[in-house]
Amino acid sequence: MSLLTRRLKPYYEELLEPLVNFFGKYNVSPNLITLFGLFLVGLGSFFLYLENLILAFLLLLLGALADSIDGALARRLNLKTEFGAFLDSTVDRFSDALPFTALGVHYASYGDETGVLLSFLALISSFGVSYTRARAESLGVYGLGGVFERTERWIVLLGSILLGLLKLGLFIITLGSLITVFQRVYETKKALEVKR
C-alpha cells in the first residue's frame, strides 16, 4: 500500500460509510456491486471514446466508488469469500484496461500516434504493477508497495479527464507505473535473497 493510500484510506472509508450501510441494509450482494462497477466503467470508457468528458468522468467515478464499496460491504455482511476476492481482482484488471483501450481507439480514429502510444504504454505499465505483486505473492513475498499504485492511477486518470489533459495524465500514469514496477522487482529480489 502506498503512502497516499494509507493516509487517505480512513477518511475515504468514512465517506463511504453511508453507502455501505444502505447496501448492507438491503443485503445487496458485494459481487453484484463489483459487476455493476465494471458496467459503469465500461459505459464511462465508451463516453471517453466519444470524447464526452463530463459523462465519462461521472461514470468512471461511480465505477471507482463501486469498486471501493464491494469490499467494505463484504466485510460488513460477513460475506468475504475466496471467490469474491478472485472476482474483484479479475474485474479490477478489466476496469483498469477499459479506459486506456477506449483512449487508444479514440486516438487511433484521429490518426494521433502519440495518443495511441501513450494509451497503450499506460495500459501495459499498469498491468505490470498488478502482475509484479501477484507473481511476488506466488513466490511468498507479500506487502509490496510502490509510489504509484491503483489508487494513484485512478486519481490521475479522473483528474486528467476533468481537466481535459488526457495525454499528460497518460504520461504520468505510465511513468509512475514503471517506477512502481522497478520498485517491486527490486523489493522482491531482496526478499527472495533473504529467504535463501
From Swiss-Prot:
The keyword Amino-acid biosynthesis does not apply. The keyword Transferase applies. Transmembrane segments: none annotated. GO terms for cellular component: membrane. Gene3D superfamilies: 1.20.120.1760. It comes from the Bacteria. One of its GO terms (molecular function) is phosphotransferase activity, for other substituted phosphate groups. It holds the Pfam family CDP-OH_P_transf. One of its GO terms (biological process) is glycerophospholipid biosynthetic process. Keywords: Transferase. Belongs to the CDP-alcohol phosphatidyltransferase class-I family. This is Uncharacterized protein aq_1480.
